[in-house]
């Protein structure tokens, strides 16, 4: 029961969720863990009630994502809906958990309507200090392609380097989104570990 309670309050976020591949895997993992608990309790106790409607509970409480692309956000919602859809059961409104916005920028002057305030958008998460798990595969974008936001990045990110790839800023943002006991896992190229432009993000990670 303690493990179940821990699972039910776990918060998992992909700050560049795209069409939801990582969020779907997180959903699958959590469903599997709850199923395992039900099976174990049945085996040990000789019976028992399964947790009702666990898929919807997970979607409402455990899974969070943000992406800049509106179409990707809608696809992510749809893929999660399809994974949990059952006859005669109302689908979740995932707009509270899966949102469209610029994960890196909270300034409307810079990002317009896509400016994203994490603490405002997910207050229930940040009341507890942040997300328990941050996962994803951030966008790899060469610095020449986002010159217009560099002044903001320089002012707001410790990892700033004029030739750094966009994914380095996602690393810093992801780390800052976690609570003090959080876990962080991104798929990343290893160039930042040796390249000059990675010096500042290496300091952030340490």
Each model region followed by its residue ranges:
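SAM-dependent methyltransferase catalytic region
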Residues: 1-206
